[in-house]
């Protein structure tokens, strides 16, 4: 079994107007040290910013780590924890209600990063 670094990540994203200007932030904690990251876009959605917070935080990690992510986004948390996103991908990004999933490029990147860790 690998002896991986344990990293805890807290994320958040927000948007004014939805769509509208928005931003994201994350705090990564490893061995008592903290690193903050943030960013934003002029025209985005709340869900995109929630996803970007997780993606950008995971991109900071340059090696495989034992990662625990905390997010207040039901969209992100439920899609990952309930494995919906994997079903959407398997079904050519069609959800159970027969509609096309949104933010496909971001979901693909998030899946790639999760599979690395």
Q: Model-found features: residue ranges?
A:
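RNase H-like nuclease fold core
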Residues: 2-52, 57-65
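RNase H catalytic domain
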Residues: 14-21, 55-117
């Amino acid at each position: 079994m690998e002896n991986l670094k344990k990293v805890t990540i807290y994320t958040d994203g927000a948007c004014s107007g939805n769509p509208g200007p928005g931003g994201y932030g994350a705090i990564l904690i490893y061995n008592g040290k903290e690193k903050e990251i943030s960013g934003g876009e002029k025209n985005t959605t709340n869900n995109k910013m929630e996803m970007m917070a997780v993606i950008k935080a995971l991109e900071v990690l340059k090696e495989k780590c034992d990662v625990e992510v905390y997010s207040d986004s039901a969209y992100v948390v439920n899609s990952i924890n309930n494995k919906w996103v994997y079903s959407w991908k398997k079904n050519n990004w069609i959800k159970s209600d027969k509609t096309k999933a949104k933010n496909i490029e971001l979901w693909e990147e998030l899946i790639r990063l999760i599979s690395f860790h």
